[in-house]
């Protein structure tokens, strides 16, 4: 969250929420991470902003998966295809991913769009507690993208393996972590550690 890493962004948060549309802060947040991670998975809703974001990762020499659902959401979607720009070693490869090819059923957009933060948190906790359905599918798919980006940074030769195969591998890995209860336990530990008195 940019507001945590960049205190100046904190003041823009309430206004951004009131506006209710994407702003420059939606672009700056992922790009201004002071940790400068070597691997990133970043969703972009606005297709016109993709070249800018991909270009930043290229210039930094970072490894990244930048993606956009064809339904216009800034996530890998389960409502249809997603477009992915894979940045590694200064080069960009474009991919089209259909979640059905990964064994994920199609969802309706209304089944996966977010809600108020409290409801989103409830949905995530339900998925981590074992609930199946469209929320689980989209969470696992996007988790797989993050894991695939990390593995690509860790082992650059992964770029020679088709992205669909890498996503399928990481999807199984994400399923295992959720189904084992480990993800729920980590969330609870993190929540407890970050409670403010």
Model-identified regions with their sequence ranges:
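Glycine-rich anion-binding loops and their surrounding alpha/beta cores
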Residues: 1-197
